[in-house]
């Protein structure tokens, strides 16, 4: 045995003395004393009694003997007599007789020591007899020590006595190191975990644990004191399993029963502050529940009868808990570690593990060292997990199979980590025999370095060893050493894996990272494939988007993992379908004039979202272990997010939506609580009038223009987006993926096509060939490509930020006839494939057909046509009727609008679909009773229909029926981003909305004078915008539907900021009760009907640009709120009128109490705060000078003032008591920006270009947000006070 004790690896600090750890292979055959602690040894000191028995096979006993010999050389006569008794018992056990010293040196040494130990005054004869007796005992002990010396420590030419004494000294050091573990335990006694524990007596503890142990005869329980490390309780089964009497364990140190290589693992896994508390329930069921939830540790425990020549270690699975035990009635309760120990049997002996379940996994580094071993390997190989960690993989393989590892790693590199099966290999079990295993391998490609970070192996035992007891110690043999061929092969593999991965093959889900050159056609469409994709190319797109990932995650969560795997096995057929799709049974029956829509349709793209029960999709899948494992990790992360359970359930239902999934409970939720997670049935009506058979393009990859009904699948983005906020953990940007935005917001009339299409039929994206479609779902490549593309998209967004910010509505080209009306709607930019491409649409707009062109436009004014039908005639029960409110001029009277064209569709003002959020809606008695005729937006007379340059009416839209405007329910929620930490990222994307600023219908959008060229066309243009926006939202693809829902969230203006001051559609003035602003026009329709960006889930496309538009169109005299409808709630509140804020009472939070709670949490976490050791600090300080100063690097330590955006340090931060207290806690100064100023967001700075623009992305977002707020305050014209920045961030 050689080498230091690795106990510190399991946890805890390094020990001062170099503790010794024997090797893993005992040397049988050496005589050894009894393994169990006996009464004869109990009188010895704690350090020397049985402390050595915490070592492996032959080591523990030799250690104990060496301690006794060394102790006797420095102790008095009493110790000599005790040593004599022990030696006599050892002689009787080992049948050995004393012999004279082996050398004169040893003899003189022993003589000198005995003279010092036993000064005698009773005469020469008594002195000589005592000396002879001492020499005799010392030589006996030395001989016993030599017999226990491991073979590897016996070297030729070395003194056996010296080697024996050195070995004994090392054993003593280990015992002392073991004792320091207990001191560590006692120091952590005051941890909070030890405060709330139930106290048990020994009788109560035995009663509770007996229900455990009686269920499994291979299980016993033991309680170890954290203060002394001694056993205070052990169950009856321990004596049977360890073949010792129960009394033998009373008062013994538990670590002395463990194999030495397991001591460190045991202490590292039983830190008191990290252990669960033993439940208070007395039933075995409750205990079992806790038992299955906690992490176990594997250790070998010594056992065997006294007559055995040496100790035998048996493997156990220990599950630790912390509790308090009162040993006696008068004694105080002491914290103890309660261990439930279950013996591990060989998987090949009865009860055997079934052959099909003899599977385990491993993970090793590029240098072929085990990094992780599945605990299922223990009964199959005989090794405990800690035996293999850090050991070379090649050392355990058969010599003939070692060269195969080089070929395996080459294939891993070629396949970029893609899982693959390989021929069987032979693995050496602990008993020395080989196990034949079928193997599968995969690699994890680091997403940034593109190198293989580690290799995963999945192994299934094919042939069991001849000796089925894999825990049998191997035959005595020299300690295995690393052969030169093993070292050389490991170096070759390591050099091989240093190469970056270059492959176009799809990568594995479990992080087998992004590819260097993903194919444009066959690469799984990541969330940002659209960034560089050619939107105008009709080539076959990639088969899946990030939206599909979210849907698949919900399928797994709600349908079951196996069903999900089977559902992905076979691609559904590529069908052609009528626009109605599978939803004809539920599709707006009152709005379906075309009988062709009633034909049974072929399953469309929505079949991807159907439940996996479809028989054509059932097929076993080749999902690998890491794919399922990563899926499980994503699901666990989703469950940790604060998504309402109703929303999650809606997500599941929309993922597998069929005609029958509009369940009754969904219908019940219609009304004040809008249900937005439902599949939009009106999406089936997208091409209702011209029921032309259409092909469905596959979403993802390079998205071709999506038209009309091709969004059936993307309806799931209504709910799959709720999982995006959790899946963004894979990327750094707090926004939904670009392709998701495109899917949700794509409009057939605005997407640039390959060429102008004047055909009268609805424009359809060309159908890719069925061969190009391959259902991928949640695969490795989707997340990896998503990560890769998001990086580039994030940088591109900043590169184009200045140019997009400079765009003005005046520079927007007139829209094509029949599609674009009035100012360029924000919906246009939704078809761009990236932020960079969005500006192109201002310069070249593709003419679209004049036939039904359902384009999503802003709706700054309500439709001039009659209001929607009453609830009884509502085509879809889950749809919420909009709140019809008149818009009053400054003189207070409602203004009529010119009559709408006779071709206006019945769905002029359709009901919005919204996600299930609670909305507070004020009744309409706050306003004058509206007349039955439509309300107008301006008093300017309208002279005839608008010119074709502004728009061309859609002739296929008949007027809707009249209905009283009394629906009082409107979706009011603004959960666009719940955390102020995402404020700067939320504002980063606001600028691209510049082109939609004029049509945004802001609080005072129509108050200012319009350009003369637009004076006549403005009212009618707005009317048609309302009509087409409404029809588009009701009838177009589900991405526009989702856009409606999500934009409604963030654009509800004061409706959201004021918690429902008369509906999300209310304009600023009307929402606050100020009716003088005729400019409020129809922000009802605008905010509740035609929002086209997914703000609800973190995408922020528009508040900055809209702020400029609102400022330009607002007159100072108007009484409006200085905010833009798209702004987040904290920005709305900062600029809201006080009267509005009275209807939105934000819970008051005392800053002092909040800071006090934070300080208490910081104090509780202080002991767990990671700290660098002095050596680490010196080492880091030699490389980074800022480490020595305890500050951040200058490149990161950039702060900005919340008022001016400058780079000046915020002075208010230095005097803050919280920061001074943080310094007292010894925490690292990891401030991210402008202190408590609040407005600086995450980055906190205002970096202005160069390299800081890349490193301070968050700072840019913060400065853009500050500038947006500043612009609004200057141009809003309202005198309403703004809330402090601190209140903004707090709320």
From Swiss-Prot:
Residues 208-275, 348-414 form the PAS domain. Disruption phenotype: Animals show disrupted circadian behavior. The prolongation of light exposure produces larger phase delay of behavioral rhythm compared to wild-types. Double knocknouts for PER2 and PER1 show an abrupt loss of rhythmicity immediately upon transfer to exprosure to constant darkness. Animals have largely affected the water intake (polydipsia) and urine volume (polyuria). Residues 1-134, 508-544, 647-698, 749-772, 809-873, 938-1037, 1051-1099, 1207-1291 are annotated as: Disordered. The keyword Repeat applies. Residues 751-769, 859-873, 955-965 have a biased composition (Pro residues). Induction: In the suprachiasmatic nucleus (SCN), behaves like a day-type oscillator, with maximum expression during the light period. Oscillations are maintained under constant darkness and are responsive to changes of the light/dark cycles. There is a 4 hour time delay between PER1 and PER2 oscillations. The expression rhythms appear to originate from retina. In liver, peak levels at CT9. In the SCN, levels increase by light exposure during subjective night. Circadian oscillations also observed in skeletal muscle, bladder, lumbar spinal cord and liver but not in testis. A motif (Nuclear localization signal) lies at residues 824-840. Residues 48-115, 513-533, 652-662, 1051-1061, 1077-1094 have a biased composition (Low complexity). GO terms for molecular function: chromatin DNA binding; DNA-binding transcription factor binding; E-box binding; kinase binding; transcription cis-regulatory region binding; ubiquitin protein ligase binding. In brain, highest expression is observed in the SCN. Highly expressed in the pyramidal cell layer of the piriform cortex, the periventricular part of the caudate-putamen, many thalamic nuclei, and the granular layer of the cerebellar cortex. Weaker expression is detected in most area of the brain, including cortical and non cortical structures. Expression but no oscillations occurs in the glomerular and mitral cell layers of the olfactory bulb, the internal granular layer of the cerebellum, the cornu ammonis and dentate gyrus of the hippocampus, the cerebral and piriform cortices. It comes from the Eukaryota. Phosphorylated on serine residues by CSNK1D, CSNK1E and probably also by CSNK1G2. Phosphorylation by CSNK1D or CSNK1E promotes nuclear location of PER proteins as well as ubiquitination and subsequent degradation. May be dephosphorylated by PP1. Residues 422-465 form the PAC domain. InterPro entries: PAS, PAS-like_dom_sf, PAS_fold_3, Per1-3_PAS-A, Period_circadian-like_C, Period_circadian_regulator. The modification Phosphothreonine is found at residue 121. Residues 596-815 are annotated as: Required for phosphorylation by CSNK1E. CDD domains: PAS. Residues 1148-1291 are annotated as: CRY binding domain. Homodimer. Component of the circadian core oscillator, which includes the CRY proteins, CLOCK or NPAS2, BMAL1 or BMAL2, CSNK1D and/or CSNK1E, TIMELESS, and the PER proteins. Interacts directly with TIMELESS. Interacts directly with PER2, PER3, CRY1 and CRY2. Interacts with BMAL1 and CLOCK. Interacts with GPRASP1. Interacts (phosphorylated) with BTRC and FBXW11; the interactions trigger proteasomal degradation. Interacts with NONO and SFPQ. Interacts with WDR5. Interacts with U2AF1L4 (Isoform 3). Interacts with USP2. Interacts with HNF4A. Transcriptional repressor which forms a core component of the circadian clock. The circadian clock, an internal time-keeping system, regulates various physiological processes through the generation of approximately 24 hour circadian rhythms in gene expression, which are translated into rhythms in metabolism and behavior. It is derived from the Latin roots 'circa' (about) and 'diem' (day) and acts as an important regulator of a wide array of physiological functions including metabolism, sleep, body temperature, blood pressure, endocrine, immune, cardiovascular, and renal function. This is Period circadian protein homolog 1. It comes from Mus musculus.
């Amino acid at each position: 045995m050689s080498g230091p004790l690795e106990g510190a690896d399991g946890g805890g600090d390094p020990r001062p003395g170099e503790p010794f750890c024997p090797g893993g292979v005992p040397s049988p055959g050496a005589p050894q004393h009894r393994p169990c602690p006996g009464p004869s040894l109990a009188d010895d000191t704690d350090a020397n009694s049985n402390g050595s028995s915490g070592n492996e096979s032959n080591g523990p006993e030799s250690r104990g003997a060496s301690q006794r010999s060394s102790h006797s050389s420095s102790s008095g006569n009493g110790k000599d007599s005790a040593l004599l008794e022990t030696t006599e018992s050892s002689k009787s056990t080992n049948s050995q007789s004393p012999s004279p010293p082996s050398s004169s040196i040893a003899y003189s040494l022993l003589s000198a020591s005995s003279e010092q130990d036993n000064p005698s005054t009773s005469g020469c004869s008594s002195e000589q007899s005592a000396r002879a007796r001492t020499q005799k005992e010392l030589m006996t002990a030395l001989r016993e020590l030599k017999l226990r010396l491991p073979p590897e420590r016996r070297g030729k030419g070395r003194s056996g006595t010296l080697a024996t004494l050195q070995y004994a000294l090392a054993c003593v050091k280990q015992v002392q190191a073991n004792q320091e573990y207990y001191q560590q335990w006692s120091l952590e006694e005051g941890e909070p975990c030890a405060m709330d524990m139930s106290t048990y007596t020994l009788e109560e503890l035995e009663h509770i644990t007996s229900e455990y142990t009686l269920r499994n005869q291979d299980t016993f329980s033991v309680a170890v004191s954290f203060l002394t490390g001694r056993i205070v309780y052990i169950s009856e089964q321990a004596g049977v399993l360890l073949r010792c009497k129960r009394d033998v364990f009373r008062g013994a140190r538990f670590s002395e029963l463990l194999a030495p290589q397991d001591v460190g693992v045991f202490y590292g896994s039983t830190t008191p502050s990290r252990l669960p508390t033993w439940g208070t329930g007395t039933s075995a069921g409750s205990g079992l529940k806790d038992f299955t939830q906690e992490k176990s540790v594997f250790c070998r425990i010594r056992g065997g009868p006294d007559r055995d020549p040496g100790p035998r270690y048996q493997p156990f699975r220990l599950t630790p808990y912390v509790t308090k035990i009162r040993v006696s009635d008068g004694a105080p309760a002491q914290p103890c570690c309660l261990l439930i120990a279950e013996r591990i049997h060989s998987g090949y002996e009865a009860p055997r593990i079934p052959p099909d379940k003899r599977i385990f996994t491993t993970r090793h580094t590029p240098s072929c060292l085990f990094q992780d071993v599945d605990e299922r390997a223990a009964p199959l190989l005989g090794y405990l997990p800690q035996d293999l960690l850090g050991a070379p993989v090649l050392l355990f393989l058969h010599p003939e199979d070692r060269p195969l590892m080089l070929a395996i790693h080459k294939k891993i590199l070629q396949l970029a980590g893609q899982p693959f099966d390989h021929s069987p290999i032979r693995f050496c079990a602990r008993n020395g025999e080989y196990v034949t295993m079928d193997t599968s391998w995969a690699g994890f490609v680091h997403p940034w370095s593109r190198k293989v970070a580690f290799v995963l192996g999945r192994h299934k035992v094919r042939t069991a060893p001849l000796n089925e007891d894999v825990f049998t110690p191997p035959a005595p043999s020299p300690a295995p050493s690393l052969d030169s061929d093993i070292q050389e092969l490991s170096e070759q593999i390591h050099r091989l894996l240093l190469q970056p991965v270059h492959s176009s093959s799809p990568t594995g889900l479990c992080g087998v990272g992004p590819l260097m050159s993903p194919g444009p056609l066959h690469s799984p469409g990541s969330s940002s494939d659209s960034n560089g994709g050619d939107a105008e190319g009709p080539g076959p797109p990639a088969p899946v988007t990030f939206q599909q990932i979210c849907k698949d995650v919900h399928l797994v969560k709600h349908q079951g993992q196996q069903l999900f795997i089977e559902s992905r096995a076979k691609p559904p057929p590529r069908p052609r379908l009528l626009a109605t799709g599978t939803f004809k049974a539920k599709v707006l029956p009152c709005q379906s004039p075309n009988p062709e829509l009633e034909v049974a349709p072929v399953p469309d793209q929505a079949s991807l979202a159907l439940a996996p029960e479809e028989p054509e999709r059932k097929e076993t899948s080749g999902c690998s272990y890491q794919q399922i494992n990563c899926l499980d990790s994503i699901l666990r992360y989703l469950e940790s997010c604060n998504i309402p359970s109703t929303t999650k359930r809606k997500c599941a239902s929309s993922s597998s939506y069929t005609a029958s999934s509009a369940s009754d409970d969904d219908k019940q939720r219609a009304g004040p609580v809008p249900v937005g997670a439902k599949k939009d049935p009106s999406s089936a009506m997208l091409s209702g009038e011209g029921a032309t058979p259409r092909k469905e393009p596959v979403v993802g990859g390079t998205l071709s223009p999506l038209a009309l009904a091709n969004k059936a699948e993307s309806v799931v983005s209504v709910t799959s987006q709720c999982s995006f906020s959790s899946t963004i953990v894979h990327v750094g940007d707090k926004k939904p993926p670009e392709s998701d935005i495109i899917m949700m917001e794509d409009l057939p009339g605005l997407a640039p096509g390959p060429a102008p299409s004047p055909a009268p039929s609805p424009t359809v994206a060309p159908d890719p060939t069925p061969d190009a479609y391959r259902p991928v779902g949640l695969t490795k490549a989707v997340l990896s490509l998503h990560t890769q593309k998001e990086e580039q998209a994030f940088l591109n967004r900043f590169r184009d930020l200045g140019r997009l910010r400079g765009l003005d509505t005046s520079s927007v080209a007139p829209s094509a006839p029949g599609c674009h009306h009035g100012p360029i709607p924000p919906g246009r930019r939704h078809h761009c494939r990236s932020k960079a491409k969005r500006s192109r649409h201002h310069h070249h707009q593709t003419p679209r057909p004049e036939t039904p062109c359902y384009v999503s436009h802003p709706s700054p004014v309500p439709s001039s046509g009659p209001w929607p039908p009453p609830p009884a005639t509502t085509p879809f029960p889950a749809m919420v009727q909009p709140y019809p409110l008149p818009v009053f001029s400054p003189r207070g009277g409602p203004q009529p609008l010119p009559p709408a064209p006779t071709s206006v569709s019945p769905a002029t003002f359709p009901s919005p679909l919204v996600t299930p959020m609670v909305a507070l809606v004020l009744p309409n008695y706050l306003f004058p009773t509206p007349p039955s005729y439509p309300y107008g937006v301006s008093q300017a007379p309208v002279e005839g229909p608008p010119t074709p340059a502004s728009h061309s009416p859609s002739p296929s839209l008949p007027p809707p029926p009249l209905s009283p405007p009394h629906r009082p329910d409107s979706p009011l929620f603004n959960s666009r981003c719940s955390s102020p930490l995402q404020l700067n990222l939320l504002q980063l994307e606001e600028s691209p909305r510049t082109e939609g600023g004029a049509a945004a219908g802001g609080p005072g959008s129509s108050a200012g004078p319009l350009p003369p060229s637009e004076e006549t066309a403005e009212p009618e243009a707005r009317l048609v915008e309302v009509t087409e926006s409404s029809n588009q939202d009701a009838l177009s693809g589900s991405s526009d539907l989702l856009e409606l829902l999500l934009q409604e969230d963030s654009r509800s203006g004061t409706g959201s900021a004021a918690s429902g001051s008369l509906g999300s559609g209310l304009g600023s003035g009307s929402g606050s009760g100020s009716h003088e602003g005729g400019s409020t026009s129809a922000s009802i329709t605008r905010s509740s009907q035609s929002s086209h960006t997914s703000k609800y889930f973190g995408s922020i496309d528009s508040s900055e640009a809209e702020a400029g538009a609102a400022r330009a169109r607002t007159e100072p005299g108007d009484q409006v709120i200085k905010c833009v409808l798209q702004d987040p709630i904290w920005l709305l509140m900062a600029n809201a009128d006080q009267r509005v804020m009275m209807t939105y009472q934000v819970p008051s939070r005392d800053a002092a109490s909040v800071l006090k709670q934070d300080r208490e949490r910081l104090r509780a976490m202080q002991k767990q705060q990671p700290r660098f050791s002095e050596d680490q600090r010196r080492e880091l300080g030699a490389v980074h000078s800022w480490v020595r100063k305890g500050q951040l690097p200058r490149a990161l330590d950039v702060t900005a003032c919340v008022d001016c955006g400058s780079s000046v340090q915020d002075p208010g931060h230095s005097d803050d008591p919280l920061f001074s207290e943080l310094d007292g806690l010894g925490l690292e100064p990891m401030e991210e920006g402008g202190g408590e100023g609040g407005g600086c967001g995450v980055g906190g700075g205002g970096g202005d270009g160069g390299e800081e623009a890349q490193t301070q992305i968050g700072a840019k977002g913060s400065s853009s947000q500050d500038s947006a707020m500043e612009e609004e305050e200057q141009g809003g014209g309202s005198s309403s006070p703004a809330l402090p920045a601190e209140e903004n961030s707090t709320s």
